[in-house]
Amino acid sequence: MFEQKSLDRIDGDYFNIIIADSQDVTIQSRNTGHYWYLHCAGYPTEEALVIFHKHRFKDWYHQHGHARSLRQAIKSIVKQDDYQLNVRKCI
């Protein structure tokens, strides 16, 4: 379960926060426009997150990976954005 203090740390300047509750977070990167859905499978703590990703709103989500905390998942997303923008240069 996501704690409120973890949810409050999501950077609203970096992400468009679509949904953020105790079990699920849906955000959109303002840098790439990609959508991310984070599901907390750990109860009662956030020790097991599944990260889903899609490139456009109309696309289907695909599983991107796992994380042990919301903070770790956010770091992974920022790293993926950096890769998309600076290595692949496809955006």
Regions found by a protein language model. Name each.
Residues 27, 35-37, 87-90:
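Solvent-exposed, non-transmembrane amphipathic alpha-helical segments
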Residues 1-33, 56-60:
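Negatively charged, low-complexity tracts enriched in Asp/Glu with abundant Ser/Thr
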Residues 4-7, 52-91:
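Mixed-charge, Lys/Arg-enriched low-complexity segments
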